[in-house]
């Protein structure tokens, strides 16, 4: 399969203005073709952008990214898997986001054609997000308790149950017909 790798180093990826403020990018980006299946793989390895003010040695602002994304598609299904971490640091405060998500669409009403509307099918979701800082932490989990049933004529879901669980409780949304859904909050 085809692939491309971009490597960023401080020696080659630093820009400094006349006031001594610097932008630095380091890390690696790899994108590749998975082969016979339509799609891509994207990998970020410690890709970090930093802003240094007035010649300081510690960054004022820094965004670091690490993780993987994979998309696959056939005429019968689409699959997206992603697992990544982002960290944003502003002065001494750091906020992180960790994401692990899998989404699958299986066609039931005909083939999936690039550039055309999705046919009838089912959608499943399973994922976790964690956002944390030195002061707070929030966790969210998404899951399809029953696959979401997509109807092309409706342009939306006509069946299925999606559950979102977070700190303090969960929300369950149930679709029963085109444009008809109910959401219920269940406290911990």
Give the residues covered by each predicted segment.
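Low-complexity, intrinsically disordered segments exposed to solvent
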Residues: 1-188
């Amino acid at each position: 399969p085809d692939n491309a790798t971009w490597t960023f180093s401080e020696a080659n990826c630093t820009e400094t203005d006349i006031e001594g403020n610097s932008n630095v990018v380091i890390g690696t980006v790899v994108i590749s073709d998975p082969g016979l299946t339509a799609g891509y793989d994207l990998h970020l390895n410690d890709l970090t952008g930093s802003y240094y003010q007035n010649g300081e040695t510690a960054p004022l602002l820094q965004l670091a990214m690490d993780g993987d994304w994979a998309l696959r598609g056939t005429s019968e299904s689409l699959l997206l898997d992603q697992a990544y971490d982002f960290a944003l640091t502003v002065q001494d405060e750091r906020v992180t986001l960790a994401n692990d998500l899998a989404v699958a669409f299986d066609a039931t009403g005909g083939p999936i054609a690039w550039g055309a509307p999705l046919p009838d099918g089912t959608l499943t979701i399973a994922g976790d997000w964690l956002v944390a800082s030195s002061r707070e932490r929030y966790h969210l989990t998404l899951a399809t308790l029953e696959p979401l049933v997509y109807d092309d004529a409706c342009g939306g879901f006509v069946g299925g149950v999606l559950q979102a669980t977070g700190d303090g409780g969960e929300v369950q949304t149930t679709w029963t017909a085109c444009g008809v859904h109910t959401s219920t909050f269940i406290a911990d």
